[in-house]
UniProtKB/Swiss-Prot annotation:
Any GO BP: electron transport coupled proton transport
Cross-link (1'-histidyl-3'-tyrosine (His-Tyr)), chain numbering: H241-Y245
GO cellular component assignments: mitochondrial inner membrane; respiratory chain complex IV
Cofactor note: Binds 2 heme A groups non-covalently per subunit.
Pfam families: COX1
Full protein name: Cytochrome c oxidase subunit 1
Main subcellular location of this protein, as a coarse class: mitochondrion
Transmembrane intervals: 17-37, 64-84, 100-120, 146-166, 182-202, 235-255, 267-287, 305-325, 338-358, 377-397, 407-427, 452-472
Binding site for O2: Y245
Pathway in which this enzyme or protein is active: Energy metabolism; oxidative phosphorylation
Binding positions (Cu cation): H241, H290, H291
Length: 528
């Protein structure tokens, strides 16, 4: 029965598919909110949204939907669940029923957040939930409380999933798949799960204290009662900075796999890649205050956080140059997945360079809360995490569905989206340099030109999204069955197994049927 299969599923592949379906819905709603923002900012003065509180609620909804309900369920929940048991050669996840509740907690979480946005004036706090804006004086209705409960449920879901992934990778590997032979995507999921496990409880503590400040008369962040509103910024960013690596590290694993497969050679410097991801995970916890240069940290503290922040460029640079070295001398196969992977490398590098600018406290005093910051984190998220997501989608979707798609259409989708997001976000660097502040629904006439270009770019991105849904529809209705490994480079490899032998063991999933059977392995594989 389909009800038992989809509502009571304990199969990692089905749960991964549910995660991917869920992220489609959230991603489309989040994209709609972003287009509303850009339409409002397309010209000076009031365009559509006369109420600034409503504008701020839309910004908050866009951020939380995209982070907690689009990127995380797709990269970690979707691809992680579907592929991880296949990559480690295990029968399923370690705790299948825990896996099920990890997904189903996201539905009430999303509903709570939707209610938070539509009850009374909505939660117009930004995703950072800073008091006093998030406190009872400024948001007197239940909206922020509902948003906090929604974040709690989402956090519990992610924590349960993280425990499951860690246990699966440590305990469920087939004979011979040592950790040093684990596929890079497996490593990425492991490091992401550890980051989730360490950072989410801090967020839970922070928003619980905010909840009691709002409703039970405590004064954790209330200056009049002896609290400190800066305290929640430290707590939030101690979670928030690892969170941005939680969003991007699974993308690193996907990009490594895709570039390796489409260059017909092993990843350059496998161990270096693994230790670079580990370093990024560890370093993510030691420079959270670079988000807080403007709150009055003393000069020694700022000097430390500048130095710590700039060190992250080393492991990130190792990864970028290893990807380039993987391409160099390979037989490049420019599939849609490879185009998105190369787009990721270029855009992520640009985002990293603007990050180097923002890491300097003296410069960040000027750039803090301007569109320069918006451009920076959208280059690493909107073109980093999302391009990685599309890259993984185009690479593995023949495996997930067992159906082929139109490669030319996939390439067209890449170019439309690439032009759209660059038109949207590159001008925002200039707006930030000119001093245009974030989270404000109006602006002086001087900023009109770049804003119009940016808003036009967002429409192009929507066209790309529509085109992608069209590709998916045609794949589901007219796609031909996939029988063999679809990404062979014909002039070099005629045989799948020859190809597998050349590429270590990061392709265990391609040894199976497409789509894999519910019980993928009849007997456990053994890695020699």
């Amino acid at each position: 029965m389909w009800k038992e299969r989809w509502f009571l599923s304990t199969n990692a592949k089905d749960i991964g598919t549910l995660y991917l379906m869920f992220r489609y819905f959230s991603g489309l709603v989040g994209t709609a909110f972003s287009v509303l923002i850009r339409l409002e900012l397309s010209a000076p003065g009031v365009q559509y949204i006369a109420d600034n509180q409503l504008y701020n609620s839309i910004i908050t909804a866009h951020a939380i939907l995209m982070i907690f309900f689009m990127v995380m369920p797709a990269l970690i929940g979707g691809f992680g669940n579907f592929l991880l048991p296949l990559l480690v050669g295990g029968p399923d996840m370690a705790f299948p029923r825990l896996n099920n509740i990890s997904f189903w907690l996201l539905i009430p979480s999303l509903l709570l957040f939707v209610f938070a946005s539509i009850i009374e004036n909505g939660a117009g706090t930004g995703w950072t939930l800073y008091p006093p804006l998030a406190s009872i004086q400024s948001h007197s209705g239940p909206s922020v409380d509902l948003a906090i409960f929604g974040l709690h449920l989402s956090g519990i879901s992610s924590l349960l999933g993280a425990m499951n992934f860690i246990t699966t990778i440590i305990n469920m590997r087939s004979p011979g798949i040592r950790l040093h032979k684990l596929a890079l995507f497996g490593w990425a999921v492991l490091i992401t799960a550890v980051l989730l496990l360490l950072s989410l409880p801090v967020l839970a503590g922070a928003i619980t204290m905010l909840l009691t400040d709002r409703n039970f008369n405590t004064s954790f962040f209330e200056l009049a009662g002896g609290g400190d509103p800066i305290f929640i910024q430290h707590l939030f960013w101690f979670f928030g900075h690892p969170e941005v690596y939680i969003l991007i590290v699974p993308g690193f694993g996907i990009i490594s796999t895709v570039i390796s497969a489409n260059s017909s050679k092993n990843v350059f410097g496998y161990l270096g890649m693994v230790y670079a991801m580990m370093s990024i995970g560890i370093l993510g916890f030691v420079f959270w205050s670079h988000h807080m240069y403007t709150v009055g940290l003393d000069v020694d503290t700022r000097a430390y956080f500048i130095a710590a922040t700039l060190i992250i460029a080393v492991p990130t640079g190792i990864k970028i140059f290893s990807w380039l070295a993987t391409c160099y001398g390979g037989s490049l196969n420019l599939t849609p997945a490879m185009l998105f992977a190369l787009g990721f490398v270029v855009m992520f590098t640009i985002g990293g360079l603007s990050g180097v600018v923002l890491a300097n406290a003296s410069l960040d005093i000027a750039f803090h809360d301007t569109y320069y910051v918006v451009a920076h984190f959208h280059y690493v998220l909107s073109m980093g995490a999302v391009f990685a997501l599309f890259s993984g989608w185009y690479f593995w979707i023949p495996k997930l569905l067992g159906l082929s798609y139109d490669l030319f259409a996939g390439k067209v989708h890449f170019w439309i989206l690439f032009v759209g997001v660059n038109l949207t976000l590159f001008p925002q660097h200039f707006l930030g340099l000119q001093g245009m502040p974030r989270r404000i629904g109006d602006y002086p006439d001087a900023f009109a030109g770049w804003n119009l270009i940016s808003s036009f770019g967002s429409i192009v991105s929507v066209v790309a999204t529509w085109y992608f849904l069209n590709i998916l529809y045609l794949q589901l209705t007219q796609g031909s069955p996939v029988s063999r490994y679809p990404w062979l480079t014909p002039q070099y490899f005629s045989d799948l197994f020859q190809h597998l032998f050349t590429r270590n063991n990061s392709s265990l999933e391609w040894c199976l049927n497409s789509p894999p059977k519910p019980h993928a392995f009849d007997c456990l594989p053994v890695q020699s």
